[in-house]
């Protein structure tokens, strides 16, 4: 019997597996795909958020700030690219300045250091190519960018060296409670474990609902991006956000650790969790909204 099974070979699954590998226990990662980082971990904004927008007092706020502080040491230990390029939240209308101040207050409450509101000539000093329509920005210098693929692979490699077993092409079909813990059923047989960590991304609700009386439903939200050539990579140096809405942080513009320029994402609720296509309308939306920033 295993002590812990982790379902999902993404960044959350392998961050968990690496931590478990520090202890004297038997752990395994189960993944339906043929390799690591095949889900959401391979397709995201690659941002290490500073932590100014999470509601103070929540687990998200605490984990965001704590995780941000870990990144310098973690990237050095595992040798993956990470850069603290800082982030800016743009305000285009003076009537929305109270919203920017609210984010600053949240940052202070969450323990995010050195966050301040910048206006006037200092905006252009930070980012010369920002739109002249920007009235003020929230500047969070601890924001960063990372390579999500190399980070996930590095976590996986370190987990494996430390004794965690990997089972790829092993789709979990059901989970049964037992007297000792859980029996995880897969297309390649059953795995018994005392504990199961559910790190299955957009499919986490399905595995939760197999064993928990508290049912969950995850509505998948698709985002489309445009990744530009390295010739455009230095157009901005910070990660540029527009003021957030209930749907998220909106269309961002950011350099990548590889020297490209990334813009996006859209935010579209969908029914098919496997739908990852891009569309002409979606990419046009990215271009139109990104142009508001710079």
Indicate residue ranges for each PLM-predicted region.
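N-terminal Rossmann-like FAD-binding beta1-loop-alpha1 element of flavoenzymes
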Residues: 2-28
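Conserved Rossmann-like nucleotide-cofactor binding loop
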Residues: 12, 35, 203
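Active-site substrate-recognition segment that forms the wall
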Residues: 15-22, 48, 78-83, 190, ...
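Glycine-rich FAD pyrophosphate-binding loop
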Residues: 22-42
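Short Gly/Ser/Thr- and Asp/Glu-enriched loop/turn motifs at secondary-structure junctions
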Residues: 43, 83-87, 179, 221-223
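Dinucleotide-binding Rossmann-like beta1-alpha1 core, especially the glycine-rich loop
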Residues: 46-126, 250-251
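Short beta-strand to alpha-helix junction loop
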Residues: 62-65, 90-99, 138-157, 276-284
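Helical element adjacent to the flavin cofactor pocket in flavoenzyme catalytic cores
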Residues: 138-195
């Amino acid at each position: 019997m295993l002590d812990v099974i982790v379902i999902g070979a993404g960044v959350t699954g392998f961050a968990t597996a690496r931590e478990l590998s520090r202890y004297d226990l038997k752990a395994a990662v189960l993944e339906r795909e043929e390799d690591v980082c095949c889900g959401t971990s391979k397709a995201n904004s690659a941002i290490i958020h500073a932590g100014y927008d999470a509601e103070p007092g929540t687990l998200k706020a605490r984990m965001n700030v704590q995780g941000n502080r870990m990144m310098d040491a973690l990237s050095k230990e595992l040798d993956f690219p990470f850069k603290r390029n800082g982030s800016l939240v743009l305000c285009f209308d003076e009537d929305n300045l109270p919203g920017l101040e609210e984010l600053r207050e949240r940052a202070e409450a969450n323990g995010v250091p050195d966050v301040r509101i910048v206006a006037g000539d200092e905006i252009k000093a930070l980012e010369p190519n920002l739109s002249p329509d920007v009235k003020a920005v929230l500047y969070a210098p601890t924001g960063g960018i990372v390579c999500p693929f190399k980070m996930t692979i590095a976590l996986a490699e370190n987990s494996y060296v430390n004794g965690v077993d990997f089972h790829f092409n092993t789709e979990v079909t059901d989970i049964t409670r037992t007297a000792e813990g859980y029996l995880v059923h897969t297309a390649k047989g059953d795995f018994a474990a005392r504990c199961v960590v559910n790190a299955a991304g957009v499919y986490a609700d399905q595995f939760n609902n197999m064993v928990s009386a508290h049912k969950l439903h995850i509505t998948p939200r698709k985002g489309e991006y445009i990744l530009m050539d390295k010739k455009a990579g230095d157009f901005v140096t910070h990660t540029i956000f527009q003021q957030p809405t209930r749907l998220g942080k909106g269309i961002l513009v950011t350099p990548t650790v590889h020297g490209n320029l990334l813009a996006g994402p859209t935010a579209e609720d969908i029914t098919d969790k496997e739908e990852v296509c891009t569309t002409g309308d979606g990419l046009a939306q990215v271009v139109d909204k990104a142009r508001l920033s710079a």
